[in-house]
A protein has these predicted regions:
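Short amphipathic alpha-helical segments
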Residues: 9-32, 64-67
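Glycine-rich beta-strand-turn "strand-cap" elements at beta-sheet edges
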Residues: 27-43, 68-95
């Protein structure tokens, strides 16, 4: 799952985000990467491995998480996309 969002304050967002690791674990969401945009560090992207699209959607739509997103300075709704892995390359060779 990819999530992209605009935030007002990275340090505040990261602090609140880090508090929610157990909630994400319980929803079957394992963080793989956090990115910031080179042109604007207030745009972030996250990559997660997920156990279930349904569980991830339920987590993201929960009132508690929606409120935490606001508290974490996320502007508007994050853009969420679900993808199926079709190929993986490690060191330029298939894994």
């Amino acid at each position: 799952m990819f999530a992209c969002a605009k935030i007002e304050d990275f340090a505040k967002w990261k602090s609140i985000y880090d508090e929610d690791v157990k909630l994400r674990d319980d929803a079957g969401m394992k963080e793989r990467y956090i990115f910031t945009c080179t042109e604007d560090p207030k745009h972030i992207a996250l990559l997660f491995a997920i156990d279930s699209i349904e569980k991830a959607k339920a987590f993201l739509e929960s009132p508690e998480i929606r409120e935490r997103m606001k508290k974490a300075t996320i502007v508007g709704d994050p853009e969420i996309r679900f993808f199926h892995k079709v190929h993986e390359t490690c060191c330029h060779e298939p894994c």
